[in-house]
Amino acid sequence: MSLPLLECKYVTEEFVREGKNGNYGTKLPSSVPMLRFLYELSWILVRGELPIQSCKAVLEGVEFLDKPSREELASCFADVVTQIAQDLTMSGDQRSRLIKLAKWLVESQTVPQRLFQERCEEEFLWEADMVKIKAQDLKGKEVRLNTRLLYQQTKFNLLREESEGYAKLATLLCRGSASSSHNASAATMGIIKSLIGHFDLDPNRVFDIVLDCFELEQDYDTFLNLIPIFPKSHASQILGFKFQYYQRLEVNSPVPVGLYKLTALLVKEEFINLESIYAHLLPKDEEVFEDYNVSSAKRFEEANKIGKINLAATGKDLMEDEKQGDVTVDLFAALDMESEAVTERLPELENNQTLGLLNGFLSVDDWYHANILFERLAPLNPVAHDQICSGLFRLIEKSITHSYRIARQTRFQSSSSASTVKLTPTANTTANRTYLDLPKEVFQMLVTVGPYLYRNTQLLQKICRVLRAYYLSALDLVRDGSNQEGSAYEVSRGHLKEVRLRVEEALGTCLLPSLQLVPANPAVGHEIWEVMSLLPYEARYRLYGEWEKDDEQNPLLLAARQVAKLDTRRILKRLAKENLKQLGRMVAKLAHANPMTVLRTIVNQIEAYRDMIAPVVDAFKYLTQLEYDILEYVVIERLAQSGRDKLKDDGINLSDWLQSLASFWGHLCKKYPSMELRGLFQYLVNQLKRGQGIELVLLQELVQQMANVQYTENLTEDQLDAMAGSETLRYHATSFGMMRNNKALIKSSNRLRDSLLPNDEPKLAIPLLLLIAQHRSLVVVNADAPYIKMVTEQFDRCHGILLQYVDFLSSAVSPTTAYARLVPSLDELVHTYHLEAEVAFLVFRPVMRLFKCRRNGDVSWPLDSGESMDADSEISESESSMILDVGTSEKAVTWSDVLDTVRTMLPSKAWNSLSPDLYATFWGLTLYDLHVPRNRYESEISKQHTALKTLEEVADNSSSAITKRKKEKERIQESLDRLTGELKKHEEHVASVRRRLSREKDTWLSSCPDTLKINMEFLQRCIFPRCTFSMADSVYCAMFVNMLHSLGTPFFNTVNHIDVLICKTLQPMICCCTEYEVGRLGRFLFETLKIAYHWKSKESVYEHECGNMPGFAVYYRYPNSQRVTFGQFVKVHWKWSGRITRLLIQCLESNEYMEIRNALIMLTKISGVFPVTRKTGINLEKRATKIKNDEREDLKVLATGVGAALSARKPHWVTDEEFSMGFLELKAPPVHTPKHASSQNGLLVGVSQGEPTGERATVNQQPESGGLGKDQMLKTKPLDGRTESIPSKSDQGHLKSKGGNPLDSQPSISKKSMEQKETDETPRISDENPVKPASKYSEAELKASSKRGASVNKSAKQDFGKDDGKSGKAIGRTSTADKDLNYLESRQSGLTKALSSTAANGSIATGSSKVKDDGAEALDAQKQSSRTVHSPRHEIVTSVRSSDRLQKRANAVEDSERISKRRKGDAEHKEHDSEPRSSDRDRSVEARLDLNKTVTDDQSTHRDQDRSKDKGYERQDRDHRERVDRSDKPRGDDVEKARDKSLERHGRERSVEKGLDKGTTRSYDRNKDERNKDDRSKLRHSEASLEKSHPDDHFHSQGLPPPPPLPPNIIPHSMAAKEDLERRAGGARHSQRLSPRHEEREKRRSEENLSVSVDDAKRRRDDDIRDRKRDDRETITVKGEEREREREREREREKSLPLKEDFEASKRRKLKREQQVPSAEPGEYSPMPHHSSLSTSMGPSSYEGRERKSSSMIQHGGYLEEPSIRLLGKEASSKMARRDPDPIAKSKSKNSNFLDIALESMTVNGKTTRGEQSGSGEIGSRE
């Protein structure tokens, strides 16, 4: 019968209809009862009205009334399904749906399968596949199981057992231990067996009773003998039943301790197995571990909260928490937290039977099984329980009792023996020694107990002492084994290694963590350090690192660390000088307990706050040695910590944290001797090996603080002067407030030395030194910096540390012999360790002073031995006789060995200009050897006397004050005596060194084959490396050069040395130096200039110190040749001033940061002596003021300092006239040129005569041997732009018209024109050279040439006016030729003088070429244009003077018109100039490359040039006749005829010009390839000069329009028509002289010109102005034709070469015959062979490729800018009489060749101007 249909109240038809539509999530209107809804839903699903899968959606959408849980829902669903499954009337489809529903409920995890298995019938479970057994079988199995569990009874057989038997058994077992012997045990065993048999007792019951009795009396050994009679398998079961009894819920009593102990004893006796009994214990391990992890996480969370700031706290609460007066430290806070945690875990020990069994094992001393349980229960941390920890402590102490007794006896014996006389150990004492050994179980126990050993500090100290004795015993065993066989020694070493590992393990896992929990017990820390100190620092640091990691794994240690960190921060907030004592002790208490955390926190605070260093260092006086060691580890750890930048964002300065850390470490190590430094030094060594040297700042601070050895770049003048003094003087100057007898300083210095040079450790002093030196060499290459500014900063920092470290080593390692034994040899330093020469000598220099003579062992190098030896054998014998005395038995090192090493340090070609003796002497000496700072000695002695006087005036007469004063007086008197004695000793030392150097000087450079390169090599190899090494070395270099000069060292030219320094090498050195190096270089330049200005101050000073010195010889190879005169020296000073000004301005106007900064630093360093002139100072001050507005702050600061320095020097600035001292005529006076000088000396005279005047900007006239060529070498075009374009732009509004000069009034002067004129200014000043004519010329000749010189000099003045780009003021300068001539004229009555017309022409060209090369110095001289400086020696004849004035006025108009015309032509025909200029430029380049061509090759060119010379002479004759004829005609006719004649010559001579010019150029082009090949090395010096030859295309000398003809009475007679034409066409290159046969006519013309009045000159000037304007317009039409002729001339040049050679050869021979007599004039300098092609390529470095055999007597002209210095006969002969005349005699044979070349170079194509300038360049460059 089926059940009626169910009435659904909740799962209604509407609900079903919505479900069929797929809307299963329809919410019911209200909550429904769960059971009713599930029942209705199940029936709906069974009937199939809804699909089974919709059940989940329906359940999710329904809301039940009672909100049941998931388990309750599953249970109700299972009940519903079970109820429906019992319906027998259900159809098959419905039942299948029901089964399907049940499966779905299980699969969807809605109902667990276990619930269906419990409640459903077997058949339903089988159908639903919920059981694997059939329904019938499952029913049978169920019946059997129920029967066995419910109806089977336990049999106890109580009827057969009698209580009497058990009573007798209990009596037998409880008799006590009186009969506990072996026989008694056997008898007891027999009785028990009898009782079991007689009373039929259950053996298991008997065994149980035996165990119970054993539990009560565990000391009764009889029970142990009774147990074996029972089966072992039963024992574990019986004990298991006992433990299970206490696991019952109804039993509330804990397990008896006796039961744990009984079980542990049975397990220990191996009667039962631990695993068999462990299975009966509860709770299970997994459950316990899970509970412990929850509680441990809670404790970790609480520990991490310690010290965190509560952001929700109000300000008032925070103030209450941080009251100033409430600074307290709770040392037990962490322990209180631990006690609370242990109290919470106390029930765990009662309920956990495993922990009870572990405690039982410890109670029976069974460590083996206890260790097994410890390892198994490690996640539970069982040691935290006091009972287990106490049992472990007892077991540890029992294990070490015997060892502790031995250790105590050994310690007592060692302490007692130390107080008595030390006995020699014997074999018996060694044999009786007891070696301590500890079992490995002790170390296992220590690892297990971990940090909880803090609970028993007494045991902790015992363990420390035992471990120390244990380790020392192993060390003794190794020492004893070292005297035995190899196998025994290896065994002892293996044992030591094992002992060390065990001790380290005990320290890391137990002792150090325990210290962290001991509240402020320094004794414990001391005991631990006694063990730690036996280990090397590497092992200690590893333990400290592991210690920190262990803290994070234990909540107890973490809490202690957090509390210590919080307390430390609170103390540091209040730490100050006032409360230092109180808070310092509190810091120490915290550090005693938690040193790692406290010290790390303090270091972190110091990195952030530098002002905390001093109070913290003072507070650390209470720390123990262990804490000091941990502090060093913390510092190294902070250094090595990754992720922190050690440089600031600018990449230059060190980070604040690193600077603070280094300063802190230096102060700490200085104050506390307990600090160990070996670890830090090893870290620095390792970092240097990796190429990282930033951390060297720590070494710098250590040396500075501990040894008071400081390195500073900004020494005062007094300090720098004292650096040359004795040790006492240096100490007083650089002690920085430290007392000499400061005991603390001495101790700290010795500690630092001992740390670097320990007795038993690797000595790191020398490895650290070598690594620093190598890092210095590589820092520039390997520096990871984007800007060179950062690289230089790193280099300077490393270099400073190197100097400081070497200074410390040399002073700390005493005596010097110990230092010599310590450092490697010079050969090893250079070749093995690859140190640079300057660094190697820095290290080896103290060792060089140990070289002593074999014969006189008391005298060491560099003192004079006092022995007299002949000059030939002196040096060689001294080399072999000096040996190195280091006090060892090693092979003696001789001085010759050092020289052999020195020879390998430089390339072989360097020794052609240097000698090893000079090189070794230079690098071996110091400032102390050369200079006695007497003023500093006297000043310091005066200070000491003042201090004594001050002490005597003290009125305090107390006993303590008197005692203190007495000690102070003794100290001062000691310093006085020492200073006085050292002053005398120093003077004797310098005198002795000077005697030795005086003996050796003659051999230093005499054997050098290439004397031309001496100064360059000396600068490159010696001066520059050392003068940039340190500030004292920069002074030393200047002193050494002065010493070379004062000693009269042969072949060392002092003037050329300064010239090469300033003109060739100074600018590149400024650009490539670092910040500190350029400061040192500036100091060297300051000292050099100071000496030079001292020589310039007075002529008497100059004559006394320089006048007769080889250093001022004109010829390199002949030291006894003529000397540079005082006038020439003043002129070269002008050149040097201009060069320095120009290069400084170029750098200041550069876009490169380094150049600007270095120039400012250089200017700051030399501001004491430079600038000298007011103009130069103003120019430099303007540049500095401009830089003050720069956005870069460091440049602003430097510029401000420079401005202040210049302002301070303003009162000392002088005018140009005062600077020139009358030797530089800044306004052109009459020029007197001797004809003979012109004809013989050729180029040489032309240069000197031409330099003060200037007509056109001849671009190629740049020849400075010493410096001008170098000036132009260095990036000429950028130099022009930077140097002069800016000033001319800024001051272009200041152009003014002055003196009625029509040139100055023209506003159309272009910028390029000014640049061109500035470029051409240098030779006008620096090339001035006094020319002394021969006595054979007449007065008439002098007068004739003076007229021409006057006109030319007037041109120079106006040319200067045009060149001035700033103020537009005309500048006039006068050649010193006429000054020296007139000076000598006053001394030598009757001496005839004359100046050639060639010289006058040369002056026109060279004067204007000086502007640009003088740079800013030209600007300095502009305001002096209207003033003429006259030498006091100038006495000019009245008639000559009046004539000169007339000609100067005429020349001014002439030059003005010519320049104006040229400027117009360039402006109109600019587009047509490129081709002619390029062709001429090519010829100029080819001419410059023709430097080293031999005389034979040159003569082929001379033959071509002779033709043009004769042509020029013929034209000169013709012009002269025409001018004489015109002189008597009216002025108007003269002007017209002169103009017509000039135009006629211009048209007529162009045809001749083409053939001659091309033929001459052909000779130059022929060997161009060979010359290029030879001069390739020189082009690097001359290429810039080539570029500079065309700084501006508008004023290119080859492309200028031809000037109009001059009036007849103004045109210089030396300028032929063709020369004038070619110069205007752009081909003017060389100077041309008059032929000797025209001398008489020239004399007459000169006399006639003297009679011209001033009115005539004015009239002619006005006429000339009008004529030139007209000529200017007419010339424009001719200019185009001239350019076409220039192109044709280039094409026809090669064709005309053969004809020119024949013609030139004949003319050259004729000229040679005419010039033979004056060429050998005594007392004059022989000119050098040169030709026109040597215009400028012989400038900077021409001497490098010049062989001695290819030049006779080479004049040093670079520093004079005028290669030939000619003396008048009387003076020259008098000087030559005092010197060796052989050099002059040797040159006579070659004078004819010199003359040929000079004449040819002057007359090639009639290009007079270029030839004279070429002479200047060539002669100067050959030096």
Swiss-Prot record:
Residues modified to Phosphoserine: S1646, S1696
UniProt GO molecular function: RNA binding
Record key words, sorted: Coiled coil, mRNA processing, mRNA splicing, mRNA transport, Nucleus, Phosphoprotein, RNA-binding, Transport
Comp. bias regions, Basic and acidic residues: 1272-1283, 1312-1330, 1356-1367, 1432-1596, 1616-1625, 1636-1648, 1655-1706, 1768-1785
Localization, UniProt: Nucleus
Organism per entry: Arabidopsis thaliana (Mouse-ear cress)
Coiled coil spans: 935-1003
Family: Belongs to the THOC2 family.
Cellular component annotations (GO), alphabetically ordered: nuclear speck; nucleus; THO complex
GO biological process: miRNA processing; miRNA transport; mRNA export from nucleus; mRNA processing; RNA splicing
Pfam families: Tho2, Thoc2, THOC2_N
Residue positions of motif Nuclear localization signal: 964-969
Subunit structure: Component of the THO complex, which is composed of THO1, THO2, THO3, THO5, THO6 and THO7.
Protein name from the UniProt record: THO complex subunit 2
